[in-house]
Every structure is written in C-alpha cells, then in structure tokens.
C-alpha cells in the first residue's frame, strides 16, 4: 500500500527537498557533510516502520520523525563513527580485517608429488 506522502518522498532528488517537504529545520553544515548518510539512515529507519492502516497525515509524521532521528544521529556524531555505508563498515579500524582463505603450498604441490 502506498500513500501520497511516500510517493512524493520517492520523487525527491536532494536532501534539502526532504527537509523542506517534511518541514524540518537543518544546519547546512551538517547536511553538507552527511547528506547521503542521513538519507541512508532515514531509509533504514523507514524500512522498519509499519505504515499499514495509517492515514497520509500519520505517514507524513512518521516520515518526519525518521528524518529527524536520522539527522540527529549525524548532528551529534560523524559519518565515520556511524558507518552507515558498507565501505565504511568494512574499513573500520576498530575491527580487524577478515582473514582470507589460507592454503598451504604443500597442499597445492601434494597432487604433483604423487605422480
């Protein structure tokens, strides 16, 4: 089920438009640094929100709340600390890199030495 509010949000193309349509104030310096991170986090929050049975005003309020929550995450933190995107999660200095598969050279040469 779709709502006019969600349809309108899906058609937006800039972070500023989301804030304008949902009538939320924002600091340009926060948005300049974290616009994609904020929208990605908003999408994560929206994905866990049920809109079933809500009228369009309630959907708009829920969308506004998720954008406000996502914005707050980055107004009080940084994209590096939040690690919303996969590339940042994979290169977390706090987490050791995953070890690749190791095959000893003897195991590779073993079939050759049995001829």
UniProtKB/Swiss-Prot annotation:
SUBUNIT field: Homotrimer; associates with NifD.
InterPro entries in UniProt: NifW (IPR004893)
Role noted for this protein: May protect the nitrogenase Fe-Mo protein from oxidative damage.
GO biological process: nitrogen fixation
Protein name: Nitrogenase-stabilizing/protective protein NifW
The organism's taxonomic lineage, starting at the top: Bacteria, Pseudomonadati, Pseudomonadota, Alphaproteobacteria, Hyphomicrobiales
Record keywords, A-Z: Nitrogen fixation
Family of this protein: Belongs to the NifW family.
Protein's UniProt keywords contain Oxidoreductase: no
